[in-house]
């Protein structure tokens, strides 16, 4: 605490022995020890009361929990990167007017309609039937 070594304590003891004398030195050491003990207890009581009033333990627990949650989030983000835009989930955009046409189609007359060859409609071989559910309807 005060970084006092053995030699310093020995020097203080010798000075106290010379000043107080051999008769009063044991009583002075005992009284000093009692006062130091009382001061330590009162400081620890004051510290505990202040911490209890301001809720330092609760604040420390909350900060600790927040740190743990932040670390957990960081670990999850490092393991699993944020989901990128899934091209299968987004509907395909309709082709632009000039995207599927050849270069010479731009010189055609405006009344001509040209269907793009890139996306021809698929012929349907099945007849269209309304969707039926095999599950019984709920009352």
Curated annotation (Swiss-Prot):
Residues 69-139 are annotated as: Disordered. Its main location: membrane. It is found in: Cell inner membrane. GO terms for biological process: protein transport by the Tat complex. GO terms for molecular function: protein transmembrane transporter activity. InterPro entries: TatA/B/E, TatB. PANTHER family: SEC-INDEPENDENT PROTEIN TRANSLOCASE PROTEIN TATA, CHLOROPLASTIC. Belongs to the TatB family. This is Sec-independent protein translocase protein TatB. It comes from Stutzerimonas stutzeri (strain A1501) (Pseudomonas stutzeri).
């Amino acid at each position: 605490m005060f970084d006092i070594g053995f030699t310093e304590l020995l020097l203080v003891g010798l000075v106290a022995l010379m000043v107080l004398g051999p008769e009063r030195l044991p009583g002075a050491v005992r009284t000093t020890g009692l006062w130091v003990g009382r001061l330590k207890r009162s400081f620890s009581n004051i510290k505990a009361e202040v911490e209890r009033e301001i809720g330092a333990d609760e604040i420390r627990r909350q900060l600790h929990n927040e740190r743990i949650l932040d670390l957990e989030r960081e670990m999850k983000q490092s393991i699993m990167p944020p989901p990128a835009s899934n091209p299968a989930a987004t509907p395909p955009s309709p082709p632009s007017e000039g995207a599927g046409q050849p270069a010479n189609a731009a010189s055609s007359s405006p009344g001509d309609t040209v269907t793009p060859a890139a996306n021809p409609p698929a012929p349907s071989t099945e007849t269209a039937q309304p969707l039926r559910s095999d599950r019984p309807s709920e009352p």
